[in-house]
């Protein structure tokens, strides 16, 4: 009845093979006892965010704003520069996922932790400086580092926001 509802297995079995079998059986996440309640709640919230994000309707399969067009299905990115020339930009999987996440929620500031959980993985153990590096590279590729009106705005101490009107369409 709810095929897009995430499944989290909560079990006492913690062996590696049990986890593999559970995930291969269709679980979206696997939590073994003993567990911390706060961690379980965080995992549930992360899974629901990903599930809800998948339900966002984009009938054309395209995200458009600030001189950028993302073809979500074909995973292609096009940028219109100041001269009106439309060029395809090659993005890595992570860069595409990051830009897509930001463009799906234009004008909304996304927290660093939320971005890390949704683009990388909720179990990411590295530094959020990785996000800064990818954002910087992405800005360079979409010509955002030369534009006085930034398309990807840094919200100090919080995260990032995509500004869909930052660049007048040519």
Give each language-model segment a name.
Residues 46-109, 113, 162-164, 170:
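Short, Lys/Arg-enriched segments at the junction into DNA-binding effector domains
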Residues 37-40, 44, 74, 131, ...:
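Heptad-repeat coiled-coil signal-transmission/dimerization helices
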Residues 12, 19, 25, 52, ...:
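Short, conserved catalytic or interaction motifs in soluble domains
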Residues 16-19, 29-30, 72, 96-98, ...:
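Generic detector of well-ordered alpha-helical packing
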Residues 81-151, 155-158:
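Positively charged, aromatic-enriched patches within helix-turn-helix-type DNA-binding elements
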Residues 17-20, 38, 73, 113, ...:
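Residues in well-ordered alpha-helical elements
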Residues 1-64, 141, 170:
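Basic, amphipathic DNA-recognition helix from helix-turn-helix-like DNA-binding domains
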